[in-house]
């Protein structure tokens, strides 16, 4: 339990493709860049300090520039000394004492693997064989004022103790019961693009699993959420939503399965590893989750079901993207795979812009498949949310966006129900939603986004998980849809058993909330990358409402690229 272990955990929670502080080959190596970043505070300063010390810049010089207390800089120095020491060994030669020290200082298995030149899984097996395991401690919610026992845990590494009878133990305060357990993966750090809507889904999913008789276990790392209230789940692990931490908790608790579809893209990205390690995913399987994300496979599914979609292509390099551009025609929407909130998405209108954006994306997210879609200029955007049990589909809400197609769905004002879609279009949306949900073998929630042009409904994408619009629909219709969906995932409820009685007179409008006053230098124009930090709900009796007229005027707005 040290400052550096805490700092490592904090940086592992950020989801920025870093494994902690240092030891991942992603640091700065240019002296001028490091000095400039130390002089001008930025979000990554916590990493730059490590790079500066490793480069040989003195602690006094760093203190002089940053005014950070020498004590903290010495903590960094001890980390670098440990990294240098470990890097001299191979996995077979490293001692238990040195490996334990690395874990106590917060280094992830992936970082240690980088130092030793081996795989993360090999480091994990090595420490397990040496009995170097996480122990879980109760968070003192009363700051030692009086004794309080709450099921609110964090992990750390301790030296084992030997009892008089020779038994070796470590003190673990998380006691495992013999009840059937379900783990719900949280949404991780709240940031622009992934906010409190997914936390709503996690909380209601936990409550539904509890109603079904399961011991509920929540894993999340953000203290500003309801899911991290210690009385929401039976057990709360306040840990990074990071593979190593999750796998250790799963091995400790041995749950019936893990729910990944309520925590947004953060949780969904871990589905592949859960599947590879034979851990049961509750609800929609990894195969179906991956099929929806794999543009090639998903387009084949759409073709088989005779569902139209915009022309698209997949590129791994800038050269491939430029070749694709000749086939797709501009404007083109460029986006990486497995991202939320439109991170890295951009509309490009010529080859120069396309090449520059693709090169930039591949530097930030190496080895990522880039999806290139022909952008349907002037189309109307709509989306549908549904619950499916693998046999039947219940569409819980269809929303029409007021802003033009191309504005991220999180930034759009949207009406529930739609205000301007004809019967032909609505029937296409219903038919497409039913076909896709069943073809993907969805068990739980699914969100599908559509572009409508000349009375034809095109599929933009399908996400077999909770979307940020589900809480809005549940609030507007006064129905516990996440509760229903979770019980469907657990096999305790069928879609045909759901009593669907939405209660809404008039229209509900989802309105994004922006924080541009906090970010004065940010481009305020809307586009495919999400910029809103929240949302509100507006109820109107009819379309003659003045507030609706004001919103509707935005339909002709220009998009930012």
Regions found by a protein language model. Give the residues of each.
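A generic structural signal for short coil/turn motifs at secondary-structure boundaries
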Residues: 192-195, 289, 469-473
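A conserved helix-loop-beta module that forms one wall/lid of the active-site cleft
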Residues: 284-345
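C-terminal amphipathic alpha-helical interaction region
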Residues: 111-157, 161-163, 167-171
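Anion (oxyanion) recognition and catalysis
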Residues: 53, 210, 275, 303, ...
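ATP-dependent carboxylate activation and anion-phosphoryl transfer catalytic cores
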Residues: 1-97, 102-106, 129-134, 148, ...
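Conserved N-proximal alpha/beta basic substrate-recognition cap immediately N-terminal to
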Residues: 234, 244-308
